[in-house]
Amino acid sequence: MSKEKFERKKPHINVGTIGHVDHGKTTLTAALTKVLAEAHGGDARAFDQIDNAPEERARGITIATAHVEYESESRHYAHVDCPGHADYVKNMITGAAQMDGSILVVSAADGPMPQTREHILLARQVGVPAIVVFLNKADMVDDAELLELVEMEVRELLSDYDFDGDNIPVVTGSALKALEGDDSEMGRPAIIKLVEAMDAHIPQPERPVDGDFLMPIEDVFSISGRGTVVTGRVERGVIKVGEEVEIVGITDTRKTTCTGVEMFRKLLDQGEAGDNIGALLRGIKRDDVERGQVLCKPKSITPHTHFEAEVYVLSKDEGGRHTPFFNGYRPQFYFRTTDVTGTVTLPEGTEMVMPGDNVKMTVQLIAPIAMEDGLRFAIREGGRTVGAGVVSKIIE
């Protein structure tokens, strides 16, 4: 069976459903595929197909995730839905399924619940840019005032975590009715309205090639008569021959000029996001640069040692620790291409962290790393991954 060719006619956006267990995330996911398949083509996916999500391994962590796709008038959406709460936590922290925006599903019959709050917090910590809200199961609420009350609660909760609670679109409906083909206001029209809200409110993400140039350095070579070459995969932006670049991290930041770019042993005028390149650097000795540093556009990223992070600690079954860790824990933090030792400070009132938990922590590294909010890392002990994290706030 030949695979269908992916036609890129519309801009592509990654989204996902978040919210409390049994509030209707998977039913909404199924309804989105069905209603939009009818409107714009594509495949409808049944609840069972989505609910029995296959397990995937991302950075050594097992996550169950369902991937569906659908199209609106103007966009192509890839949508992730997770069966269990733990899968959401892992997914958001590891960035296994990057989200350009989230659909927060809240049952109108129950209002916001503990996981509603936790998912909003996670979305804030890992830097999800936008949220739209679907007040589900609204057919079970007869009282219009009650619906308004739940909407107010959700907006306040979003504002508590620095989202724009006053202006975030809130769409009211019933995913189940929509899935059953009901054409009343709560049914299919509510799904269309939700997608219009997503089109309008979730911003188009910047393409990697449009960002400031950044390349994590993987290897360093000395080529006699030519100088020093650093190799790696360009993470974002473009590097042109003759441009100034900085080497950031581990030691003091150094400025140099890129005098050559090569790929597959051929010389190029430039390298761009996604390319595996070698960059020839002027006046840099082999010992001036090492794996773990980054090559970047000058002044675009800075080195830091002290930061706050949201971390998921692998369970014993995932090959993680068998025992908890405490304040002052000193593992290695693996950023991009290298390990740096760091000391963990737990939040006040948290005595210890058990395998399988997620926790907010502060980390002090022994050497600086080129860092920005949203940077992902692994926590390792002797080369074995015991946790995954994301930088939520740089301190210094």
UniProtKB/Swiss-Prot annotation:
Reaction(s) the record says it catalyses: GTP + H2O = GDP + phosphate + H(+)
Amino-acid positions noted as binding Mg(2+) in the UniProt annotation, renumbered to this chain: 26
Binding residues for GTP: 19-26, 81-85, 136-139
Disulfide bonds: none
Region (G2): 60-64
One cellular component (GO) term of this entry: cytosol
G4: annotated span: 136-139
Top-rank EC class of the record's enzyme: hydrolase
Gene3D superfamilies, per the entry: P-loop containing nucleotide triphosphate hydrolases (3.40.50.300), Translation factors (2.40.30.10)
G5: region residues: 174-176
Keywords, in A-Z order: Cytoplasm, Elongation factor, GTP-binding, Hydrolase, Magnesium, Metal-binding, Nucleotide-binding, Protein biosynthesis
EC number assigned by the record: 3.6.5.3
GO molecular function: GTP binding; GTPase activity; guanosine tetraphosphate binding; translation elongation factor activity
Family annotation (Pfam families): GTP_EFTU (PF00009), GTP_EFTU_D2 (PF03144), GTP_EFTU_D3 (PF03143)
Family, as annotated: Belongs to the TRAFAC class translation factor GTPase superfamily. Classic translation factor GTPase family. EF-Tu/EF-1A subfamily.
HAMAP family per UniProt: EF_Tu_B
Subunit structure: Monomer.
Function: GTP hydrolase that promotes the GTP-dependent binding of aminoacyl-tRNA to the A-site of ribosomes during protein biosynthesis.
Protein name: Elongation factor Tu 1
Protein species of origin: Halorhodospira halophila (strain DSM 244 / SL1) (Ectothiorhodospira halophila (strain DSM 244 / SL1))
Record lineage: Bacteria, Pseudomonadati, Pseudomonadota, Gammaproteobacteria, Chromatiales
Gene behind the chain: tuf1
